[in-house]
């Protein structure tokens, strides 16, 4: 897409979905607006709340003397797995690293991009961008890399809802600095969180790959719970390279193109179905079987039906679904073995985790995709396997702790109602526990330095 056409293209794509009114207006005005906006009258909604709530953010300045109204201040901690005094690239070459936001800081990832921008052995940086902060250090690092002669290829998704204007402005900044900009795919939104750094090594090249569940956004990394894997696994890097090559051609990868990554729209849903079938087969053969999934929403009928099949086969299925969930658990003869909980706490639960199996045979993935049809077959999404033993244990701990949350967690019942949970003698707030652990780990790391 030519740069000069980007703004007009966005105007064509944008269309209203509803009209909110702060007070009643006469029917003729509604008729005129309905005709002009080409939107049905049932989508005109009167609300009692102010139409623009942005003023709420300013209230904190007027309520400073009422600290009882505020949460206790929490600051993301430095992970003990990395030293910010050394090259992040060099450290990741030795060992995979899993960052858990907002409990751990995003600083190591930003430093890695800055290191890559200055490293003479780095030849290219490729990224998919969906939402970024207004004053983004990530964008600054990419610009510096391009100005230093690196090949920087960035796919900017212009259809990220509510961020269209910011993404257009950001893409222009990158392009002016010499970055090659890809403006998404016509048929699919690119929602994946993928970054690939390529370095010269001897007579060949080396990949450093980052795959995450959340956006490359410094602000939301302090407000959303997300996971970010940084790995020097060369086969995962080769898969990521094929994903970017396909995107540069305006295409998406197919089953035969990738060996490790699950990539929607063509090879994510079917792979998940296969892994659910494996657990059903294990249960039928008398072997241990387990499925655990943490997502924002569950609406994909193909995956719902397959989870019900697993439950009917006797497989234990644990689902952490923050929002929409179109499966009713604990229905006799259908979902007896499915448990669904939702955690709504101080931070927005946003990470996606897929678990299949038990013990040494367990497969663990982190992903950008929810179990929604829009994610599994209508977007470009990426899920990565986690192979590092420490990272896998960290994900298990996160998942299992959330499953015991009886402070902010609610359990979905067969009648569709969410109820309080009583599991622990002292209620557990999983998010608070993760922050306490992050503080302790950071303190121990500081003591050992």
Per-region residue spans from a language model:
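Active-site core of PLP-dependent enzymes with the aminotransferase class I/II
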Residues: 133-140, 302
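Single conserved hydrophobic/aromatic residue that forms the stacking wall/gate
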Residues: 1-7, 12
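PLD/PLD-like phosphodiesterase catalytic module centered on the HKD motif
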Residues: 1, 23, 148-220, 230, ...
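Histidine-anchored nucleotide/phosphate-binding helix
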Residues: 8, 113, 137-147, 307
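Glycine- and acidic
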Residues: 15-17, 93-100, 121-128, 151-157, ...
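Internal gly/pro-rich beta-alpha loop/helix module
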Residues: 31-38
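Active-site cores of enzymes that catalyze phosphoryl transfer or operate on phosphate-rich substrates
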Residues: 41-124, 203-275
């Amino acid at each position: 897409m030519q740069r000069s056409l980007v703004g007009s293209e966005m105007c064509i794509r944008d269309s209203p979905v509803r009209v909110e009114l702060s007070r009643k207006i006469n029917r003729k005005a509604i008729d005129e607006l309905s005709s002009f906006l080409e939107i049905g009258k049932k989508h005109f909604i009167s609300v009692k709340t102010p139409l623009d709530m942005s003023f709420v953010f300013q209230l904190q300045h007027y309520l400073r003397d009422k600290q009882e109204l505020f949460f206790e201040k929490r600051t993301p901690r430095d992970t003990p797995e990395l030293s910010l005094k050394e090259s992040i690239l060099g450290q990741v070459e030795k060992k995979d690293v899993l960052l858990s936001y907002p409990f751990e800081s995003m600083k190591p990832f930003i430093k890695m991009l800055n290191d890559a921008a200055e490293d003479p052995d780095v030849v290219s940086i490729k990224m998919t961008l969906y939402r970024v902060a207004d004053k983004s250090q990530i964008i600054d690092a990419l610009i510096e890399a391009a100005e230093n002669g690196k090949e920087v290829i960035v796919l900017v998704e212009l259809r990220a809802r509510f961020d269209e204007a910011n993404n257009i402005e950001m893409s222009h900044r990158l392009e002016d600095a010499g970055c090659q900009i890809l403006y998404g795919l016509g048929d699919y939104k690119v929602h994946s969180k993928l970054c690939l750094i390529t370095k010269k090594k001897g007579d060949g090249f080396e990949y450093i790959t980052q795959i995450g569940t959340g956006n490359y956004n410094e602000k939301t990394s302090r407000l959303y719970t997300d996971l970010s894997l940084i790995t020097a696994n060369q086969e995962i890097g080769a898969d990521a390279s094929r994903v970017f090559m396909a995107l540069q051609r305006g295409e998406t990868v197919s089953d035969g193109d990738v060996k490790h990554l699950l990539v929607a729209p063509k090879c994510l849903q079917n792979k998940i179905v296969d892994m659910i079938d494996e657990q059903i087969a294990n249960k039928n053969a008398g072997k241990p079987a387990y499925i655990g999934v943490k997502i924002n929403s569950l609406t994909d009928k193909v995956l719902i039906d397959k989870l019900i099949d697993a439950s009917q086969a006797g497989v234990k299925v644990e689902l952490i679904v923050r929002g929409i969930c179109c499966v009713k658990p604990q229905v006799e003869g259908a979902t007896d073995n499915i448990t669904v909980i939702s955690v709504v706490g101080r931070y927005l639960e946003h990470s996606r985790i897929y678990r299949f199996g038990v013990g040494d045979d367990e497969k663990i993935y982190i992903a950008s995709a929810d179990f929604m049809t829009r994610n599994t077959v209508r977007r470009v999404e990426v899920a990565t396997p986690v192979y590092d033993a420490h990272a896998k244990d960290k994900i298990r701990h996160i998942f299992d702790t959330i499953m015991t949350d009886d402070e902010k967690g609610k359990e979905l019942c067969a009648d569709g109602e969410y109820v309080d949970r009583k599991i622990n003698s002292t209620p557990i707030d999983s998010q608070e526990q993760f922050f306490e652990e992050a503080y302790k780990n950071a303190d121990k790391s500081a003591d050992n330095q």
